[in-house]
Every structure is written in structure tokens, then in C-alpha cells.
Curated annotation (Swiss-Prot):
Present with 1710 molecules/cell in log phase SD medium. GO terms for biological process: defense response to virus; mRNA catabolic process; nuclear-transcribed mRNA catabolic process; nuclear-transcribed mRNA catabolic process, 3'-5' exonucleolytic nonsense-mediated decay; nuclear-transcribed mRNA catabolic process, non-stop decay; protein-containing complex assembly; protein-DNA complex assembly; reciprocal meiotic recombination. It comes from Saccharomyces cerevisiae (strain ATCC 204508 / S288c) (Baker's yeast). This is Antiviral protein SKI8. The lineage of its organism: Eukaryota, Fungi, Dikarya, Ascomycota, Saccharomycotina. One of its GO terms (cellular component) is nuclear chromosome.
Length: 397
């Protein structure tokens, strides 16, 4: 299987500091940065339209932001819900509802106060929305804190309307419970994900991944650094379930290299690794996915393709079934279309010619506008040169 991805749009100097995370929904792409701002980028652009002309920013926190995720859903009575959750470097977990003005279509950020005073005392790190396709079941939010605890909430958009004919927007988060760190002393919980099969994966800085059951919050099994024993790896950078929830992809370090290991989720068995040949004197041939850390992972909508974002300035695409590399996209600062927005060196004078990739997300077919948008997969990434870039598959089916 061969795929070719082509650049469709980009924005250099998209933020005034490093862009650590990106998320997407049908309407928007959302980025967050160390400059403390959330930015919402309209997915529906006209040909040759500058993404910055349809972007909207909101200052959130002076310490900067490092994780973001967006939940978009159509609730009862066609009520449209678009919620953004983000975490700051001071440990705050913050929420915004995104709406548009009826006439101007300008984006409005409505801050939501969803945590009680005791919960606000915790220092949060990674987060993930879990959308429910069943209106009888609540959407979920999972987040980790720096002590290794995973928190799970149920999200309720409306007040109790059992005796009312109209919906009353009154968003609340109901704490379902917590999953404690499986280790003593506790380790830093670096990443988290939630699957459609009702599983939670929490990754830790010592190379351990814990799998828990969403309905009961019961820990099912740990990957006790199995990959650490094999590849001398440590910190977990990303955990990502496949769309069907049958696979879990884990990005982890091995010294200065980046590794990807696949597990099936029913029994937690390791089914293989994704790798490219390397002739480094530090490594055996064919053990690593990237020549530097793998910062992020994203499955396409079918779960057949996995994209990995590397600190080596590469996006790699993998056939999940064969575990073979399909293609590689190389980032370069000169890819940015507007010359004055090119950031070739950082504030320390170090080169950004091949900027590392902080985060990557596949976008579903039809989310972006343009030629072939309904037929082709697309994706977005954010890079160390403070750029945000969109690509789409050439061809499609």
C-alpha cells in the first residue's frame, strides 16, 4: 500500500511561542502554545485563503498551555456542542465552549467553570475527551495529574430536564472516580487515551502503561516496561487506541531514539514494533521508528494507518497490518508559504531548518474544504518552528 500526502495549507509563526498540542473536530483545528493562547483555525477555507485570516485566538493562562483536546457533538434537539479542554504549565485544567455569532460568524470563547475548589488544587497534565455516540451515555473526560493519578469525569451539558420540555444549558462535570498509579513511589503520568471499547490507557515516565476499565475504573493489566526491558526505553510520549479500540500504539524513548510498540487490547499482548533500518553505532539494525523521540501518534479513521510525529522533523506513516512504513514527510522551515513567517532559527540561534514535530492529528474525510476533501484523508501537525501545517492524501477512495 502506497500513499502520498501533499501540503494544502500552512501558517508560520502561528503562535508567539512553541506550539505543544493540536486537536481537531469537524468545524475547527485547535492549537495551544507556551504563549498562553488557544487558537481556533477554521477548517473550511477557500482556495488560496490564508489560514490566519480565519483564525481566532483567546488568552488563557500566563504560564502557557501544553495539552488541548476538543469535543464536538450534536445533542438532543440539534443542540451543537463544541468544548475545548486545555492544561496549563501551572497545572490548571481549563474549559471553553466555542460558538459563533449568528451574523458575523466570529468565534466566541465562553469560559466554563467545571471544577470545584478542591479539584482545582490538583496539578493536571495530559487530558482526553471520550465522545459517546449513545445519547443515553455521558461523554467522558480523562486527565492525569503529576502524581500519577488518572481522573475520570462524566460530562452533563444540561440541567435535569426530566420535567421540562426545553433544554437548559448548564454544563457540569461529575467525578466518576480515579485510577491510582500502579507504582510506589508514584510516577509522572505523561499521557492518556480512552477507547471506544471502554478502556483507559495511562502512560508514565518510567516506561509503564496501565490499562483500566472505564465502566468500573478497575485496573486490568500493566505493561511493566516490557518494551523497556527489550529496548532500554524510558518515558512514554504518547498512547493511542485505534478507532475500533482493538489496538494500542505506544510511543516511547530508547535513549535518543523513538520507538513505537503495538499491543492488542483484549489480553494486552505485544504484537510487534514499527521500525525503519538504522545504521547507528548505538543501535541494532531496525529497532527504531525515528532517529529522535516520537512525540505523538494518530490513527486514521479506519485504523489501517498510523502516523508518528518525530523530533527528527519527520512524519512517518505506517501500515498497521503489515507493520511496514508507507511513506515519510520531511518538515522544512522553507515549506512555509509566506516568507516573513518563516522561522529558521530559534531565540538561542539554533537552526530550525528541519523542525521537530510536537503533535499530529488525522482529520476525518470532509472536515477540511478544498478539492477532494470529501474523499481524501487529511491531517494537521504543529512543529518546533511555531508552524501549523495541513496535508491531505493525494487520491483517496
Amino acid at each position: 500500500m502506497s500513499k502520498v500526502f501533499i501540503a494544502t495549507a500552512n501558517a508560520g509563526k502561528a503562535h508567539d511561542a512553541d506550539i505543544f498540542s493540536v486537536s481537531a473536530c469537524n468545524s475547527f483545528t485547535v492549537s495551544c502554545s507556551g504563549d498562553g493562547y488557544l487558537k481556533v483555525w477554521d477548517n473550511k477555507l477557500l482556495d488560496n485563503e490564508n489560514p490566519k485570516d480565519k483564525s481566532y485566538s483567546h488568552f488563557v493562562h500566563k504560564s502557557g498551555l501544553h495539552h488541548v483536546d476538543v469535543l464536538q457533538a450534536i445533542e438532543r434537539d440539534a443542540f451543537e456542542l463544541c468544548l475545548v479542554a486545555t492544561t496549563s504549565f501551572s497545572g490548571d485544567l481549563l474549559f471553553y465552549r466555542i460558538t459563533r455569532e449568528d451574523e458575523t460568524k466570529k468565534v466566541i470563547f465562553e469560559k466554563l467553570d467545571l471544577l470545584d475548589s478542591d479539584m482545582k488544587k490538583h496539578s493536571f497534565w495530559a487530558l482526553k475527551w471520550g465522545a459517546s455516540n449513545d445519547r443515553l451515555l455521558s461523554h467522558r473526560l480523562v486527565a492525569t495529574d503529576v502524581k500519577g493519578t488518572t481522573y475520570i469525569w462524566k460530562f452533563h451539558p444540561f440541567a435535569d430536564e426530566s420535567n421540562s420540555l426545553t433544554l437548559n444549558w448548564s454544563p457540569t462535570l461529575e467525578l466518576q472516580g480515579t485510577v491510582e498509579s500502579p507504582m510506589t513511589p508514584s510516577q509522572f503520568a505523561t499521557s492518556v487515551d480512552i477507547s471506544e471499547r471502554g478502556l483507559i490507557a495511562t502512560g508514565f515516565n518510567n516506561g509503564t502503561v496501565q490499562i483500566s476499565e472505564l465502566s468500573t475504573l478497575r485496573p486490568l493489566y500493566n505493561f511493566e516496561s516490557q518494551h523497556s526491558m527489550i529496548n532500554n526505553s524510558n518515558s512514554i510520549r504518547s498512547v493511542k487506541f485505534s478507532p475500533q479500540g482493538s489496538l494500542l500504539a505506544i510511543a516511547h524513548d530508547s535513549n535518543s531514539f523513538g520507538c513505537i510498540t503495538l499491543y492488542e487490547t483484549e489480553f494486552g499482548e505485544r504484537i510487534g514494533s514499527l521500525s525503519v533500518p538504522t545504521h547507528s553505532s548505538q543501535a541494532s539494525l531496525g529497532e527504531f521508528a525515528h532517529s529522535s523521540w516520537v512525540m505523538s501518534l494518530s490513527f486514521n479513521d479506519s485504523g489501517e494507518t498510523l502516523c508518528s510525529a518525530g523530533w527528527d522533523g519527520k512524519l512517518r506513516f505506517w501500515d498497521v497490518k503489515t507493520k511496514e512504513r508507507i511513506t515519510t514527510l520531511n518538515m522544512h522551515c522553507d515549506d512555509i508559504e509566506i516568507e516573513e513567517d518563516i522561522l529558521a532559527v530559534d531565540e538561542h540561534g539554533d537552526s530550525l531548518a528541519e523542525p521537530g514535530v510536537f503533535d499530529v492529528k488525522f482529520l476525518k474525510k470532509g472536515w477540511r474544504s478544498g478539492m477532494g476533501a470529501d474523499l481524501n484523508e487529511s491531517l494537521c501537525c504543529v512543529c518546533l518552528d511555531r508552524s501549523i501545517r495541513w496535508f491531505r492524501e493525494a487520491g483517496g477512495k
